[in-house]
Swiss-Prot record:
UniProt-recorded name of the protein: Outer-membrane lipoprotein carrier protein
Function: Participates in the translocation of lipoproteins from the inner membrane to the outer membrane. Only forms a complex with a lipoprotein if the residue after the N-terminal Cys is not an aspartate (The Asp acts as a targeting signal to indicate that the lipoprotein should stay in the inner membrane).
Keywords from the UniProt entry: Chaperone, Periplasm, Protein transport, Signal, Transport
Subcellular location per the Swiss-Prot or TrEMBL entry: Periplasm
Primary localisation category: periplasm
Subunit structure: Monomer.
Gene3D superfamilies on file: Lipoprotein localisation LolA/LolB/LppX
Top-level taxon of origin: Bacteria
CC annotations in GO: outer membrane-bounded periplasmic space
SUPFAM superfamilies: Prokaryotic lipoproteins and lipoprotein localization factors
Amino acid sequence: MKKWLAISCLIAGMTSTAVYADAAKDLQGRLNKVNSFHANFSQKVTSADGAAVQEGEGELWLKRPNLFNWKTTSPDESTLISDGKTLWFYNPFVEQVTATWLKDATGNTPFILITRNDASDWNKYDVRQKGDDFELTPKSASGNLKQFAINVTTNGTIKQFTATEQDGQRSTYVLKNQQNAAVDAAQFTFTPPKGVTLDDQRQ
């Protein structure tokens, strides 16, 4: 009896691993169908008990594998740009720019996951799929990300994604008016404005 139970558990484990792998492969395949796009987005942040923390909106330009311009227009303006090597974060309100190497960006940051769409990143997650919805759970609980969910159509259009942190805070981004077309390279270049403080962490 114990032998059959052990075999059953082994088979179940193998099946589960295969399901996770298939879901991850499907997700990566869908994202690969659209390599550059522009979209508007709305953001809603809620606490663990569901209370509204913040709402916002902005625009997004992306070109895989490593180029993006994430511009938040409300409630406060900020810009996060990757030029392929450096990750620039500009906050006009405090007149500060932070520069870090993109290669040092954590793989458990949802937007970096989407932008890279690299198998080595997805392999760090258990991926479950239900139709166009994909749910990702980190295999390691050492990071701040508890769960990541994304809705991607079969033609590669991202409808929305949600990041849930370890403390239960949830950030949901809904993408609208996505235009799948080439993006001007100028969207992915950044020069710190004169007079701002530069916090250069590329050391």
